[in-house]
Regions:
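N-terminal accessory regions of nucleic-acid-interacting proteins
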Residues: 1-49, 53
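Conserved acidic
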Residues: 48-50, 59, 65-114, 120-692
């Protein structure tokens, strides 16, 4: 084989030939040892590697089961791309790298892999891993051998590889498009074209360029492991400027009971559809969304500050007084609770109910009525429940309250810094990278506040992922450890109240449009009718409130004021239909689009168009070219298989298999829709059931 392999690569604006090494021909003497340290125990070779594999799959039976295998691997090391076709070659190559760098005990080379969770399923049996850090079962952040440390660059960037390369300056090797047909079965002996090799080349070279760009502001020992690590570091630095912030943090220390209660109270965004307008194609639909919703709540609202105290609630008057004066959390039990008729979007999710009676009606996972239910709520959530529902009795247990006030100024200033930077750079093509960096940091600030302090440890052992359940004593020790750690600075309750305030503001928007609401999702509401003046009035009122509290929720850019927290009008829709949460299609300026959780937007819209358009967005409609896949995990020790006459080693693997997607509405949900919309067939069906 020639020393160099020709690769036809996709560059930023053109294609060109690039040259790679085959692993057996790589000149290891060109590698330079250069060690960087972080503390006593983190010692790394300065130059990281990037690694990727390409795989094929074959059926193992007639029931849709597959196994996958690697047919080529590629590495970029110190800017050089290297190919190999078999696992034994990879093992030998890595051993040679370790020898070339003359790594001593405790010294490691970092190997970045974009979506390490996929590659790890293949490599786990070919290396002796001493430490695997899994964020969830089969979700790998790092995996270490004595001299290698595999890291996930997807979790570092929070972007697809294509977007990571596209959004990073000084990158030349772009992610290939349609240069490699994944449906073709290839083996380690299958010849690859220069274009196919170029696709493989770019995957590791482009990623290497991204990592090296990031390392201009860091070194391999200091660079964060995740995207939120950057903003956590910035915010910690800002908060440490004021020693009083540490005192507030320690005074806010949670007991285990209080932490569990806050975990019960935590919810994400409110995503749901109006049962009166679900499963209907609606014309001339408007849309508003909240500008930078979560960051706005953090600069404008009052949050728990200081100790949480236990309170006894004996009557409604006491409850109302505490809920108005403090931030509160508690477990609420309601008897004979029922949604008011004029409320289009039910607020209480079944999934958050701690107890739920048998006599109940549930629409798309939301409570319409129940003979009783128990749920943990903040005072913000309780106010929304009180507006939406009527009930016969209420009981309040485990009531806790904390004094409230603005978040520390240093944290609010950091949020405004990112908002200003993002706003000033928006639309500036020359500074797109800085814009995306500021935007991602702005959006990440909320995320770091809701990191689970008592995250369950996932133990990886011989290919198995075991969730280690913490005892009560271990949980208490973990909480104590968190508050004693001088790097800790965030109050978990802040994140819980961020989302509660955001849901409150979304509820305000739903109140603005009333029964004209069609759909809402976290920070946006879609509706029929003309409500522009209503939203203008709401925005004016909100800005007056901010001015009164001396909250500056805007910046000036080129003579224009850009606000956080107000409702901005979006492009409307010619036609719109929803079948429930995370499930809708629309026509916008004549273009058909689709948003369905688990369904490819592009492929879904294309197939829906071929089926006949938006009116085929119906219950039981099957999408065959959905872009949806299922993951089939196969565990096996190292063994040989023969495919198309080629015998090679393989082991555990992961087959990604295409599957169909069927639009669904449950029978119960459909019954509710037909009843409230007064459809004829509902009455006929009801009468028939009575006869039977």
């Amino acid at each position: 084989m020639d020393m160099y392999i020709r690769c036809d690569c996709q560059l930023k604006k053109t294609r060109c030939l690039q040259y790679a090494y085959y692993c057996n021909d790589f000149p290891f003497d060109i590698l330079n040892k250069d060690i960087v340290k972080s503390g006593k125990h983190k010692i790394y070779q300065k130059h990281p590697m990037t690694f990727d594999i390409e795989t094929s799959k074959i059926p193992t039976d007639n029931e849709g089961h597959y196994e996958a295998f690697m047919y080529i691997w590629q590495i970029c090391i110190e800017g050089n791309v290297v190919f190999g076709r078999r696992w034994e070659e990879l093992q030998q190559f890595m051993n040679n790298v370790i020898k070339a760098y003359k790594l001593s005990e405790g010294e490691r080379v970092v190997v970045y892999v974009h979506n390490l969770s996929f590659e790890f399923q293949f490599i786990q049996d070919f290396f002796e891993f001493t430490d695997v850090f899994a964020m969830e079962s089969r979700s790998i952040l790092t995996a270490k051998t004595p001299h290698l440390e595999f890291r996930c660059s997807y979790k570092l960037s929070n972007m697809s590889l294509a977007k990571f390369i596209e959004n990073t300056p000084n990158t030349q090797h772009y992610k290939g498009v349609d240069d490699l047909d994944y449906s073709t079965v290839r083996t380690p002996d299958t010849p690859l074209t220069e274009v196919e090799l170029g696709y493989c080349f770019n995957d590791v070279k482009g990623l290497y360029e991204c990592i090296m760009e990031l390392l201009k502001d860091d070194n391999i020992a200091s660079i964060p492991l995740t995207s939120t690590g950057y903003v956590r570091r910035d915010c910690r630095k800002a908060m440490n400027k004021n020693k009083n912030n540490r005192k507030i943090f320690l005074r806010s220390k949670l007991t285990l009971l209080q932490y569990k209660l806050l975990r019960e109270c935590f919810r994400g965004g409110n995503t749901a559809s109006n049962r009166y307008l679900t499963n209907l194609v609606v014309k001339n639909v408007g849309s508003y969304d909240i500008s930078s919703s979560y960051p706005f709540q953090m600069i404008a609202r009052d949050f728990p500050l200081g100790k949480w105290n236990y309170g006894v609630i004996r009557n409604i008057a006491t409850l109302e007084e505490y809920n108005s004066k403090y931030c509160t959390i508690a477990r609420y039990t309601f008897r004979n609770i029922k949604l008011r008729e004029n409320k289009p979007i039910p607020y209480i999710p079944q999934a958050k109910c701690l107890k739920l009676g048998c006599d109940r009606e549930i629409y798309n996972g939301r409570i319409l009525h129940a003979d009783y239910l128990t749920i943990s709520l903040t005072n913000i959530d309780f106010d929304i429940v009180k507006e939406q529902y009527v009930y016969d009795e209420i009981a309040v247990e485990e009531f806790h309250y904390s004094r409230k006030g603005p978040l520390p100024k240093e944290l609010r200033d950091t949020i405004m810094y990112y908002f200003e930077k993002k706003s000033r750079l928006k639309g500036d093509s020359e500074h797109y990278y800085e814009y995306m960096k500021s935007k991602n940091k702005l959006n990440s600030i909320y995320g770091m506040t809701v990191t689970n302090i008592l995250n369950t440890e996932i133990e990886y052992k011989h290919g198995e992922y075991i969730k280690k359940q913490m005892t009560e004593e271990e949980m208490k020790e973990a909480l104590d450890k968190y508050y004693k750690n001088h790097r800790s600075f965030l109050n978990y309750s802040w994140g819980v109240f961020v989302t509660a305030y955001a849901r409150r503001e979304l509820e305000d928007a739903l109140n603005v449009v009333g029964l004209d609401a069609i759909y809402c999702d976290t920070d946006s509401v879609k509706y029929i009718g003309d409500h522009d003046r209503d939203f203008e009035a709401y925005n004016e009122r909100l800005n007056r409130e901010c001015h009164k509290k001396k909250v500056v929720n805007y910046i000036e850019v080129k003579g224009n004021l850009l606000y956080m927290g107000i409702f901005d009008k979006e492009h409307g829709y010619d036609e719109f239909i929803t079948l429930g949460a995370k499930k809708y299609a629309f026509l916008q300026k004549g273009k058909l689009s689709i948003t369905v959780s688990g369904l490819s937007k592009n492929k879904g819209a294309e197939e829906l168009g071929k089926k006949g358009g938006i009116r085929r967005f119906q219950r039981n409609e099957v999408f065959y070219n959905s872009g949806r896949t299922i993951s089939q995990y196969n565990s096996a020790s190292v063994h040989e298989i023969t495919v198309d006459g080629c015998t090679f080693s393989t082991a555990s693997n992961l087959a990604i298999v295409d599957t169909t997607y069927t639009l669904g509405i449950s029978d119960t949900m459909l019954d509710i829709i037909e009843r409230v919309q007064g459809k004829k067939n509902y009455e006929e069906k009801n009468q028939q059931q009575k006869k039977n």
